[in-house]
Amino acid sequence: MAQKLWEKSVQVNKDIERFTVGRDREMDLYLAKHDVLGSMAHITMLESIGLLTKEELEQLLAELKTIYASVERGEFIIEEGVEDVHSQVELMLTRRLGDVGKKIHSGRSRNDQVLLDLKLFTRTQIREIAEAVEQLFHVLILQSERYKNVLMPGYTHLQIAMPSSFGLWFGAYAESLVDDMQFLQAAFRMCNRNPLGSAAGYGSSFPLNRTMTTDLLGFDSLNYNVVYAQMGRGKLERNVAFALATIAGTISKLAFDACMFNSQNFGFVKLPDDCTTGSSIMPHKKNPDVFELTRAKCNKLQSLPQQIMMIANNLPSGYFRDLQIIKEVFLPAFQELKDCLQMTTYIMNEIKVNEHILDDDKYLFIFSVEEVNRLAREGMPFRDAYKKVGLDIEAGKFTHDKQVHHTHEGSIGNLCNDEISALMQQVVDGFNFCGMEQAEKALLGR
């Protein structure tokens, strides 16, 4: 069994080891590629300040590229008795290179190493989430334009209210995603600052070149203050979780709408048959299980910031092992959200709308405000027009031609989808993922 990086003469109690390591071996597999990339940047910097020779650097880089390839193939494991990915990588280098492998940790702590790994992992995941959100956005805008002239009932308090349109419905969720992406961009900017060199949280007596590792890893800038770099652990995950939760909130609401509007009592939309499931007892059933599960998963994601907040709450400055537990709820969350986005994008692209829903007589009164506004435009005071239409409804005399005349920005007749698309493009352009992608390729020599 491998010796711990910190182990000296006293052996660790096995129950204590099991408890303290917890699920870290499992969780750290998410971080393995990023740990290798961080080490490649770190040793390149170490060679520049004379702590490694050029030959040692070349040996270490070659072995790290081999380890990186094994991660990509899904062959990398963290051995029993090894605490984490950092220890596993150093162990593999030491086995292959002897004393040269032992030099890799100079000027570094697992505290700044894991924080770096988390930032590298998270910014990659944010890029994938942003791409998935953008795909869903374009589908929603496409459907909004396709059905912009098809009316549907609008509800308040779950009561029939005013005319809406499928163009408005699809477009509303598209614009919601624009705001969500702004949250995600703020999280990305916080994530894209280099903590490496903060070591255990108080810096190092080695003359580290933190600007160099910042450039090598494609970060926008540094976490300058080494104490704050470590204080940012927990805060980083919480703020990213808020961004994920914001997107999840939009998807959850859309899923609820789709389930409700697909039901026989509404009949506004029809989900694709291949996206529904059946019943073991009722042969007629076509259940919207995909959106029900999406709703539940997204509601779970909306609890993530609170979970992280409670784990990291009331900690003073400095590193604490409490922070390890955040990985268990944080790292898997990205894939859950990506799955929900993928399912939602597919179904929204295939969904069918009922173009004749307002032919049902129960929706006649939905046009009452249209009639009030018509009378007001003809000169009747609004309140008098309101009362007249109300009395006509009570007397059973209300009629309307079921036409709407909305022209202002963002209304049925003027969706402003071009303006909404321009807003989304502005946010997308603001991410600037190119720097991180180019830096990672350069480190790997690709």
UniProtKB/Swiss-Prot annotation:
Disulfide-bonded cysteines: none
UniProt pathway: Amino-acid biosynthesis; L-arginine biosynthesis; L-arginine from L-ornithine and carbamoyl phosphate: step 3/3
PROSITE patterns hit by this protein: FUMARATE_LYASES
Pfam families: Lyase_1
GO BP field: arginine biosynthetic process via ornithine; L-arginine biosynthetic process
An annotated Gene Ontology molecular function: argininosuccinate lyase activity
Localisation: Cytoplasm
Keywords associated with the record: Amino-acid biosynthesis, Arginine biosynthesis, Cytoplasm, Lyase
EC number(s) recorded for this UniProt protein: 4.3.2.1
Keyword Lyase recorded: yes
Main subcellular location: cytoplasm
Cellular component GO terms, alphabetical: cytosol
Gene3D superfamilies referenced in this protein's UniProt entry, alphabetically: Fumarase/aspartase (C-terminal domain), Fumarase/aspartase (Central domain), Fumarase/aspartase (N-terminal domain)
InterPro entries associated with the record: Argininosuccinate_lyase (IPR009049), Fumarase/histidase_N (IPR024083), Fumarate_lyase_CS (IPR020557), Fumarate_lyase_fam (IPR000362), Fumarate_lyase_N (IPR022761), L-Aspartase-like (IPR008948)
Reaction catalysis annotation: 2-(N(omega)-L-arginino)succinate = fumarate + L-arginine
Record family assignment: Belongs to the lyase 1 family. Argininosuccinate lyase subfamily.
Protein's recorded name: Argininosuccinate lyase
Gene field: argH
